[in-house]
Design a protein with these regions (language model features):
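Conserved catalytic alpha/beta core of Sir2/sirtuin-type deacylases, generalized to analogous enzyme cores
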Residues: 1-327
Length: 327
């Protein structure tokens, strides 16, 4: 099915990132003006831009309360921490569990508490309220599906790195994905989690939950009964299914349709893990279009190339707090 899509926004954005690395001087700026001036300018740009491209990284979900360590980890993974010495949700995803029953018990929780619940803070919904009447598109390396949960138009979203809510077969010949919601719910119940009055799984008061699921619940591919894995870009076997290619082409088309307009590249919570997908391409596209403005909002990590500092807004702070200030 992917051959039906002629434009690959993912490939094009990676190329733009490479171009940025080759062409930039390497001189970095933290932007111009005090924070109050930057906030005022940001509010004006969101209001007046012809198009807005949101580039979202892990910092956005962290701001929304979907943290991978601390209280959330201790609340839902305390037993794994005690038995296996796992320190946080992220590192637990790489732990060599002793068997599949334990591995998939972990992943059921990992997926559920990041994909199938609403975040503690309304950061995504507040972002949508700022953009709902705008000409926008979202590219994100996040895999937690929180944009759609908040009500963003799914036709304006490109999840480049996969989705916690999808499985794929380990058989690389099967190039499609499978919704895992029903499986996740069964696996959570099998571990002893109970639902609260809002229908959300919680740990029972006695904390008696299990770190294994029944063998018959280990997910298998419905097409060839092979083992399954989560649809995440962790190696060259990541499945770019029809939905992925459709979104990639939509992103490409949005950039093409708006490339000579007053376009706002709004980067939220993008760190150093995947700068080639969002940060560097945003820099390059801002350089190429004199009408473009680049925005970087992040906690403790905000900067832009010196070449575009006059058309950049860099705000160091919690994303949710910044959005509240410009509502």
């Amino acid at each position: 099915m992917k051959n039906c899509y002629n434009k690959n926004g993912y490939r094009e954005t990676i190329q733009k990132g490479l171009n940025a690395i080759r062409s930039l001087s390497g001189n970095i700026s933290i932007g111009k003006g005090i924070k109050e001036e930057q906030l005022k300018k940001l509010k004006s740009e969101i209001k007046n831009a012809d198009a807005i491209v949101i580039g979202a990284g892990a910092g956005l979900s962290t701001s929304a309360g979907l943290t991978y360590s601390g209280n959330r980890f201790e609340k839902y993974f305390f037993d794994f921490a005690e038995k296996y010495g796992i320190k946080d949700i992220y590192s637990g995803g790489f732990y060599p569990f002793p068997n599949n029953e334990t591995k998939w018990a972990w992943w059921a929780r990992h997926i559920y508490f990041n994909r199938y619940i609403n975040p503690p803070k309304p950061v995504y919904r507040n972002l949508l309220s700022l953009l709902k009447d705008k000409n926008y598109f979202v590219i994100t390396t996040n895999v937690d599906h929180q944009f759609q949960r908040a009500g963003f138009d799914k036709n304006k979203l490109f999840y480049t790195q996969g989705n916690y809510g999808l499985f794929q077969s380990v058989n690389s010949e099967i190039q499609k994905t499978y919704n895992n919601e029903n499986w996740v719910m069964k696996a959570m119940e099998a571990q002893g989690f109970i639902k609260d009055k809002n229908g959300v799984f919680i740990v029972p008061d006695n904390k008696e939950i299990f770190m294994q699921i029944p063998t018959n619940l280990i997910p298998k591919c419905p097409d060839d009964n092979s083992d399954m894995t989560i649809n995440l870009r962790v190696d060259n076997y990541f499945v770019e299914d029809e939905g992925w290619h459709k979104a990639s082409e939509a992103y490409y088309n949005f950039l093409e349709e708006n490339k000579n307009k007053h376009i706002l590249f709004l980067e939220l919570g993008v760190g150093a893990n995947t700068p080639m997908i969002i940060k560097y391409p945003f820099w390059q596209m801002t350089i190429e279009n004199e009408k473009a403005v680049y925005v970087c909002i992040n906690y403790g990590e905000v900067f832009c190339p010196q070449e575009i500092e006059d058309r950049s807004i860099c705000i160091d702070g919690d994303i949710g707090s910044v959005l509240e200030l410009i509502k």
